[in-house]
Amino acid sequence: MVDGDARSELLSADWNGEWMRLQADRRRADDSFEWDKRARHFRPLETAPYARDFMKLLALKPGESVLDMGCGAGSIAIPLAQDGHPVIAADFSPAMLGTLDAGIEYYGLEGRITPLELAWDDDWNLVGPIAKAVDVAFASRSVTTTNLKGALAKLDRTARRRCAVTMVANSSPRYDLHLMNAIGASVTCSNGFVYAFNILIQMGALPQVTYFESPRRDTF
């Protein structure tokens, strides 16, 4: 096969269709009820190294407004608001947003963070932020959707300046690889970032890619 043919097949491949097929084959889809049960464990008491690294890569300008899609309990929304950024913090889990509300009150961030119950698969024209509502829209390890292309397009329509997405490029940070290896358990590595990159190329974007470590750290 010549190089030209290889490039043609790559660019014409139905990356989003393959993503949707993979999501349909998953053993259990992510839903708000699962995250509701985890919410009490997610109250951010400090800015984690991952959040600091991600915020550095965002390279926000002073005072820029942001959409944090899939904000969880506010591990990134809270430090961004503390830095003076107006934040729309959206999540599909009411319990996560309840934990976020507690964090907003604890840190005195009323008026800086606007919680919003919102799922990727919702009709954003009806319940989502308006087009170009914020300077920067991002999703940090939170692209839980059957339609990846649609999700990326929703971020794009919401942002005036730029969008950012982080996706796991190895095993999930939920797992301790040292422990899993020690007990002989297998861990499935994620390749979702490959689909995101190629879908963005097909959408006419020129995505910038950066890899950074996100080591697991347990505290007791």
Model-derived features: where do they sit?
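A short, conserved alpha-helix within the catalytic core of class I
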Residues: V143-T158
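Class I SAM-dependent methyltransferase SAM/SAH-binding core
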Residues: Q82-D123
